[in-house]
Amino acid sequence: MIFPVLPFLVGSIVLSANTQNATEKNSTSASATESATTEKTSSSTDNKAPEQSKEPPHDPEGVKPPEGFQWKIWAKEPLVADPVAFTVLNDGSLMVVESERQDRGVEDNRYSPWWLMEDLRARTVEDRLAIYTKWASKRVNGMDWYTKYADRVKHVTDTKSGGVADTAVNFSGDLREPLDGTAAGVLQVGDSVFVTCIPNLWRFQDKDGDGVAEVREKMFTGFGVKTSLRGHDMHGLVLGMDGRLYWSIGDRGYNVRTKEGAVLQDAARGAVFRCELDGSNLEVVFRGLRNPQELAFNDLGDLFTVDNNSDGGDKARIEYLPDGGDVGWEMHYQTLEGANKRGPWDQEHEWFMFDPTDVVQPAWLTPPVAHLTDGPSGLVAYPGVGFPEKYNGAMFVCDFLGGDAYSQIWSFKLEPKGAGYEMKDAEVFLREVLPTDVDFGTDGCMWVTDWFDGWTSDGTGRLYRVWQPESFEKSKAAGGADILKKGFRGADTSDLLAWLDHADRRVRQGAHLELAARGGAAIDSLVALTHNFQTPERARLHGLWALGVVARKFGGTTTGDKACDELMQLAADPDSELKAQATRALGDSRCAKALDLLRAMTLDENPRARAYACAALGRLQDKEAIANLTAVLWENDNADPWLRQAATTALARIGDRAKLEVMAADQFPQVRLGALLALRQMRDPAIGRLLFDSEATIALEAARAIYDLNIESQMPMLAALGDRFCDH
């Protein structure tokens, strides 16, 4: 029987590599995280919940912000109840997602153990519906159980300018089909409101202005093939600097057909998706997540999430999400207990921080940036206005633990380190609140949704505003709220260019996306701005991002060529960050005439530029770059896991098996490992040749790949590998 071979080999190979010190690291992590570390009820109840308050609902005695900040209740039940997520519109009103289906329509395998094995086998949403139908007798009123309650999106407004909400309208209509839920993400872009509610990504539009959507379009369907744990749903809708829509899903998996006819499928892993606003070019950009809640871009246009722990002694993780990365979680790990608790997730240190001396942690995964929170939920990047300067560059994450006495909102900063990031300045920002989501209004105030109590839907909820008076006045003086309310479509080009240096990142982003949409009418102005060294760096950066959008959307035209030419100029800029960003944009826009430049950029002294160059060459499938990528692997020598990931993902996308086999025989182990990691992404049986590598860690990595991917042709060789470590 082959099944027990890999765990045995892991232990044997690790011992042969003398890894005692590596396996002892983080030895205190389990005891530090075995206490209640739970996800928000509207998203999950992964851990044992504290007892729900038996007292009637009451207003909190006081949310506790930092000294000098103020707060107020803006809305409460019945206007807002069971709030999961929200977005602040440019006119100052809110779209709030409510979920009344928690544990009464949105289910959880832990409380429905009878269908666990079937759920593990499910591959499509139709499979899940068949499971619900088969076991309908377990529910009160059978299948009606799944349609009695609804999730929805409410448009909540202060129509009387009284400083509190006074009106709430059911904007989306009820979402109550058996496969639905949790509705957990909402974002307005233009006249469209996008909503994530498994199994669908929705687009809603209110054409007649009555506050209710007449257009209800399922852009995509097929998300959430499994039940998994309650709350491991679709979240995190956010607009990228590239003008594309991004969102996340937990380990309920997906089986989705794109507009172009391709099928994206992974039944047991969470992921991050992106597509154009019209739904074209849907793709997976990151894999292997467990329960990522919201997504947030920082001021450099890099993407992050905070992913929850599994109650197995592991910790919640801040994850940097580079294109093609993989965290390593699989849904069935949650079911493993006893001596094999959480399987390789814990035993092979998959959730650990990167340590170059730890030969146990797999090289194929993308490690976390930091461990923070116990129940991560809503996430937002500070837009640059409304708070004191100490929060510039900060992110805020909700830490939901089932009661306001032990929940909070954290602030933290992320700074580039090598090709990745490191966390700085983590501190609790807001206490005495049970937060599900956090965002910033156009006026600079922070908004927070409060589930209020417990884990299940009970018809209560709050919406708070938090602000610092002096900084709030400065935010008003900056005028960003007026700009955002008026919109960008009718603005003069000169104003748009000036706004690229606005204090509010949302204004800068809106301006650069509008300039990009104008294409040829704005290209010369963008080139002049980015080419001028006297232009402030952040204005040049947003101008560069606009050029990247133009190069992508107008490729093959004179306008697109102009944008590509300027990006090539910027890739030689003395500003190291602009150089790195231009490199990324060239690959993202598939600018083929930049290939020579991109190959040269793999030697750049800035590791961010090197990583982006690798990613670009992979996107362009440049076979001539294999030597450059090999050099990156050799020089890096496994020191920077994010740079290694960029190079190996590029090699996999290029997909030249013959050259990878040559690399697999290279004299340098870091090159052989890089070839193996690329072959793993390709699911190529050629991995088998590395099972007997002289480096035990490479042999282990090959064994993992064959076992994890079930490469049947190599299973006999994997079994034979036991002879290398068995005593006879």
Language-model features: where?
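Sec-dependent N-terminal signal peptides
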Residues: 1-20
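Active-site proximal loops enriched in glycine and acidic residues that flank catalytic Cys/His/Asp
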Residues: 307-308, 322, 368, 383, ...
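Alpha-helix capping and helix-loop boundary segments enriched in small/acidic/polar residues
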Residues: 225-228, 259-263, 280-283, 367-370, ...
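Cleaved targeting-peptide boundary
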Residues: 18-28, 46-50
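Beta-propeller domains with acidic blade repeats across secreted/periplasmic ectodomains
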Residues: 34-495, 516
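Structural detector for internal amphipathic alpha-helices that build alpha-solenoid repeat scaffolds
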Residues: 478-487, 506-519, 538-558, 565-572, ...
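Secondary-structure transition/capping motifs at alpha-helix termini
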Residues: 161-163, 208-212, 275-280, 385-389, ...
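Buried hydrophobic core positions in alpha-solenoid tandem helical repeats
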Residues: 219, 495-497, 525-530, 566-568, ...
